[in-house]
Amino acid sequence: MDTSSSSGTHPSTFNNLTKQQELTGNDPNDTNRKRIRVACDSCRRKKIKCNGSYPCGNCIQAKNTSNCHFTERPVRKKLKPTKQDNKSTANSNGVSKRKYNDTFSGNSINIKTEKQENTTFGINDNKSSDLESRLSRIENSMSRMMHTLENFSQNFMTQAIRNNHSNSSMFNNNSLSPTPSEDFNKSAFDSEEQQTSHSYKNLKDRVKDANELLKLRNWDEFVGTHSITCIFSRESLDWMEKTLGSYGEEYLTPIRNLPLVFHSELKPYIMKWIDPPVVDKLQRKKLLESPFPTDSKLISKLIDLYYEETSMINILVDESRVRSLFAAYYNNFAEPIATKRRRFKLSELLLMTSILLISLSCLTEDDFSEERITTPASSTSSNYSAASANLLGDYNKNRLIALQNSLENSAIFYYHRISVISEGLETVEALLMFIIYVESNWLTSFFNYTIITVTIRFAQEIGLHRAETYNNLDLEEATKRRKIWWFCYFFDIEFSFKSGKPPVINTNDVTTNSDEDLLRVITQLKQYGPLSPKDRMYSPVCHTISTSLLDLSGSDSICLDILKIIQSGDILDDPFYFQFCALLQSRIRSNSYHDLFIASAEKRDFSSISNTLEKLNADMFELAMYLADEAKPRFYNDPKFTSVQASTGTSIRRDTILAMKLTFFSHLMIINRYPLMIATEDSKFDDRVIKFRNLSLDSARTILMLIKGWHRESASALFYNWAIYFPVAAYLVLVAAIINHPQLPESGTNLNLLIETSLSFFKSSKQWNSSNDSQDKQQNSTICVNKIVAIELIVRLMLRVVIKVYELHNNVEILANNPALQNHLQEAEEKFPDIFQNHAEFTSKMIALVGASPFGGCGSRNTSSCNLRDNSTNHGQNNMNPSPTITNNTYNSNINTGSNSTGEPQVCYAQSPSYNASLSNIINNESTGRSPATSTSINQSMMNENYDLFNDYLIDNSAVNLPFSQFNNLPNFFFDNNLGI
């Protein structure tokens, strides 16, 4: 047998294959090829895949072999075989040449063996070489990118140092990293691998340095970032003044003068806390045994009129308990045997006093008292009657204010004692009630931080924050304690977000009112069965939950299951529903603070911040999903959105729903501003920052739309004073958005909303309209009187600034075409012209008016140098007969240190100046604690002796140790210029 036929390919066959390869340019023996070198003309015309054979597979299938034609192409030149055939050399792409040498030389011997070698070794070499080539190209590209990034990083660090630390010596040239050009010069003689490694390490070091520079001012965020008050910080005011250019000083001067005015308003109230009257043995006996008026009917009617309107109080302390306390108090005077009389604890006295103060504060405020006294039929309270209104009508406003001032001094006396040594659960309860009263005053609520802190510490001492301490208690006592702890938890986080203070409670150490604790309570409630609807602790809602929740299974959240159960039905009149929803909101708000604002929160990576914020937003929206339909928070552009004016139901129900919605949108507004307040190296490249900004602004717009048409006369003074914070905060957020980006299309819409809100909701109140009425200038001691005027003044001043910024940047006229708006803004300057004066000139007048710092004390006990309390106030106070046994209450009239010619008592405070008729009414207001008839002048030596801390403020422009001094250290409220819009 011919060995050639068995050992190799037949010569004729080989010649045909060679001819086909020359004709088509394709190797017919290479069956693994993915691409062909030449396709036939028919396949090329039809743009279909050709197998490259002759005739090709497509033409054979179409039975059109005669038309299968390959256009002539130059035949590839045969490569000359090298001497070292067994050695394969790599081309520039790392592909072995051995295969091509053997193929194109026509040597078909051992083709199968050659293919196996390629399969075994050639492909592996190809993959390895190709990977090395790609890595080399990537390294070259990264080297070029690093050069650009290093230049960017260097410029960024230089700008950060120039802006934030221009006066600091801690950054010098020796501490900075080498410049990019120096790095590349040093690495010019290195290998490519060494250069890449060095550049990468250098880039990491520079990014780290940039991050450290960004974090150097994170102390600014310790206070104020999660609050809205930082808009009045020094940095914020300087930024606004710079934005206004040549108009900056004119428009910012009245805002800079406001702290001086606030100090004059706060001084009488501060004096009550830091320098209370001295109490002797007789006065102490009166405070412990007979601190209330002799008229028991007045007390009863005050409770009738206002107790039912304050749903928060009704949750904390049951009305029957309060009435029993006052009944026992007045029964003591009918008991002839002293040993049988009930001795009240200081905590009980503080509780009773706080309730009366809350009621009186509603009566003594001008914008709330008239309608509620003269039109009792409009009230929904079952206890409100015409007889009650007539009884209160016998007590004019001056007498009620005198009583309020007396009870306020008594409450501070009780607080100073029980804040040192607690009397147990009653102390926590009384302090919470006192917090409600102090919180109702916008100007003085900063005192609450200390009271809240003391209250929480006392609550933790008796274990209210740990669920295991409730195991051996009966259901009624355990429910009461959980309710008290809820108030502690609520006020802690509420005050934190309003004032910018850090919360006191560590949530990791709290188990009360957790999901496990709620499940335990529900299990106990199911054993009791239906309970009386009159018992607020065991409402029908609680019974519905106990009978339905345990039948559900597989849920991730017990709280959401509870909301599902009580989603329908008449539940909004039940205080438990508001309490429970506020608990869930407080949880999310607490998590927000601990995830975003604490020092240990991660701030270097914007992505992690965004992920955290998205989770918090999702929690808020999930909560809203399961709320009752009427209470469900909806944005202003939702078709189902309704304002307060369109709400139905009782005033309590309307206020409860409004409170839930305001809290919800306020929290969304604040936390979604946080990414705008920080600077990270990657925040400008993440489009989520725009989404957060839009969510914050939408929430602010929704708040202003919610209160549209809300008449303050329709709400109780307690609720209005608490809720007024939310529209003011939303107003300022939109102000900041417009000033930052006045040329955005949305800025015009936002400005129209601000103007409309100012002309409607923040319109002239009764106090504003009567501030120029000279015959109404009379002494009163309540600090609440000027609160509404201060808010309206702030709103008008900020609107004045934002309109000017918008006009300058858009070349439009807003005020010229709106006479009503002109009058609205002009009223502020007409009524309070002094705050528009030069800061130094206004300061000199304030020195002559305000006098000594309240922290300095009287340098002399000379009656001629002491400010005198209005005699009419003391006279009215004595006529009230506050004590059944002592008609002249010297303590509540303030301890007098001298007397005038008529023998009337006089009160010595820290040195105060005379009444100045040339100053505007915001200074000579009835709430300033001064009267022309009773004030005397202060000499210059006395002023220099006592004008310590306040004098420092006037000279150094920093309110050292004053309540508003923190504003100077708050961050810039307007820092959202990293948006790239």
From Swiss-Prot:
Changing E461K: Gain of function (GOF) mutation that leads to hyperactivity conferring constitutive high CDR1 and CDR2 expression. Residues 1-33, 74-106, 165-199, 868-902 are annotated as: Disordered. One of its GO terms (molecular function) is RNA polymerase II cis-regulatory region sequence-specific DNA binding. One of its GO terms (cellular component) is nucleus. Residues 1-29, 868-880 have a biased composition (Polar residues). It is found in: Nucleus. One of its GO terms (biological process) is filamentous growth of a population of unicellular organisms in response to biotic stimulus. Phosphorylated. Phosphorylation leads to hyperactivation. This is Transcription factor TAC1. The gene is TAC1.
